[in-house]
Amino acid sequence: MKKYFVIALASLSIISCNRQLTTALKSSDKDFILNTANEFYAQKKWSNAIALYDRLPNLVAGTDDAPEVVFKLAYANYYDKNYRLAGHQFKNFAGTFLNDPRREEASYMAAICYYQDAADYNLDQTSTESAINMLQDFLNNHPNSDKERAEDANKKIDELTQRLETKYYEQARRYFRMADYRAAVTAFENLLEDYPSTKLRQKSFEHIMKAKYELGMHSIYDLKKDRLESAIAFSKDVERDYPDTNSSKEAASMREKLLKELDRHLKVIEENEKRKAEFLEKQREEELKKREKEEEEK
């Protein structure tokens, strides 16, 4: 019985809210609409509050109520998880109400909305880059912001930056798994250039080492020497930067094989050059004999 009573009360509450919303939406009384919107806002009925706040900007333009309406509309959309729209509204507030004491908060919340809207690392990262820019702009424009807010912004920038690093690392790793070693090397090198302090640096070095090893050991003749020498040089970089690690040991092991392959390849080059020289010499001698014979026949 109690269960049905609770359901009945909930139904009556919904009907009452809907009636209240409908009445306010049909009204042209600014104060009535605003008060009703504020009631829904206080009750955390965000969609109802949004519907009414959306009606108010033109009605309150130029009045003291205007900043409050824009500010609460932005927050209502934020709480309703309409992050992109809320971010635009907070940004608009900060750019419009320059002397409002909540301007810094609005700038901060605009950045937070972009942060909330940022995609997972395996999706397009345009929103993530926008969020980083917004958070950095907030720090630049509000250097005297309270410590907690500044620390939170920096923390979120680090988090989003790591998300980008992971995105580009996984892209590079995908090239590596596909055995597209040239593309893998380029992608890992771009990652290290763009994010020199990345926590994925050592793993990137390991993949570059392996990719260069594969390129050198299985290269075509004309490119083999340069690729072997490049892999050998990089193995030394790995040992220098990560001494006494598995990465260093693996690089040393690869270098030993690379040096043997380079030595073998240099001998092949030497032999080919020798044969080429012999062929050219023989060709020259034959040409000389041909000319001598032609001279005798004259």
Region annotations inferred by a language model:
Residues M1-C17:
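Sec-dependent bacterial lipoprotein signal peptides
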Residues Y4, C17-K298:
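Acidic, polar-rich low-complexity tracts and alpha-helical solenoid repeat scaffolds
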